[in-house]
Amino acid sequence: MAVITMKSLLEAGVHFGHQVKRLDPRMKRFIFSERNEIHILDLQKTLQGIKDSYELVQSVIKSGKKVLFVGTKKQASEIIEQEAKRSDMPYVNNRWLGGMLSNFNTIKKSVQKLKKLEKMEIDGTFEMISKKEVSQLNREKLKLSKNLTGIKDMEELPGAVFIIDPKREQIVINEARKLGIPIISVVDTNCNPDVIDCPIPGNDDAIRSVALFTKIISDAILESDKEVGIQIVENLNEEDLMSEIEVKNEKKEL
């Protein structure tokens, strides 16, 4: 059973939002306070978002569908790949190609082409053609691989999409909403939470925060067949929480 504590969220810097001037007004309901012109997110609502997302993910996996992990920003790319592979889920961590969801059949043809090129390399076909042709095919394979490797085994549309930084991944959101695919996403203070089915208020820039959220989703997938949920440990009262925020805020300013 995954155990999430308020302290672990604080240590990952989950509570730090953006500068006050960058606030999306629709995020006001997730704001706890303001410190040194930085918004502090309400971790109680973060915990609720984690719980809701955990339950949705497990429901999707039990239905036989997959969760597509998406995070193309520098801080998220490697983490998205690692956690998606750990839970044997599809992922996109380089660039979202328009139509990956809304034009899935066309994308599948590109995936089939990539698989064919990989097979040609393995079965000795490359050894039977000219170096010039091999060079051209390798360039084509590299180009396809860069954007499609993570979804090579995604035979059908996912049951849900998990996103890091919805502001950056707006095309993904538009496609998922059009198809009625549930969206789980970490929402920072500059994001619009209203287009997300399961918003998780949190820092989507700090690597430790991104890693924590992505691991939680991966854990939910891996534990879906064990009939276990998530344990939330709220081990800080409001006074302790404010004290921790002050300390963390001072460290951030240094």
Swiss-Prot record:
Record's protein name: Small ribosomal subunit protein uS2
Gene Ontology molecular function: structural constituent of ribosome
GO cellular component, one term: cytosolic small ribosomal subunit
CDD domains attached to this UniProt entry: RPS2
Family as reported in the entry's similarity comment: Belongs to the universal ribosomal protein uS2 family.
HAMAP family per record: Ribosomal_uS2_B
Record's keyword terms, sorted: Ribonucleoprotein, Ribosomal protein
Record-linked InterPro entries: Ribosomal_uS2, Ribosomal_uS2_bac/mit/plastid, Ribosomal_uS2_CS, Ribosomal_uS2_flav_dom_sf
Intrachain S-S bonds: none
Tree of life domain: Bacteria
PROSITE patterns registered for this protein in UniProt: RIBOSOMAL_S2_1 (PS00962), RIBOSOMAL_S2_2 (PS00963)
GO biological processes: translation
